[in-house]
Amino acid sequence: MPTSKYRIDTHLFFTNGEMIKLKYEDLLEESKASNVYVIENADFKSSADGLINGNVIGINRKIQSFCKRTCTLAEELGHYYTTVGNITGQSTVSDHKQELRARIWAYNKLIGLNGIVNAYQHGCHSLHDTADYLEVTEEFLLEALQYYRGKYGKYVTLDNYAIYFEPSLGVLELV
């Protein structure tokens, strides 16, 4: 069972007193280092969670979940690094491919195979605990696992671990 934790501002504190920076703060720092300006409480006319225009990212102020804000910022940064032009209409195959590229960037940034193993090493044995540990929504984690399943098949090995995607997420330490 993971150590319990609580949040103050942009830092996470474990009950044992250890403090870690949240991924959201890391993404904000990465944005700044890449000269990307983030408007954290944007007032959108659309229902989008996040939008990017050039080097300006807006995060919809209606998003209350900290994990959802993290996932949204990661995906918008993925667009900054991997897409070209306006793809908001999703009207072409190229637009869909660029959207997927941005999502894959976000999956790998926030989760990745190492993140799955780290969650396991920290006692996470359910999707809820794993998502909580990785600071992502369960929906985002499930979408990432579906992508990884499509890319790697039923399982993949990483160092001395086997990560199973079917029938459900599982991590096995190899001897």
Q: PLM ranges: what are they?
A:
Residues 1-72, 77-175:
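Active-site hotspot residues in diverse enzymes, especially metal/ion-binding acidic/histidine motifs
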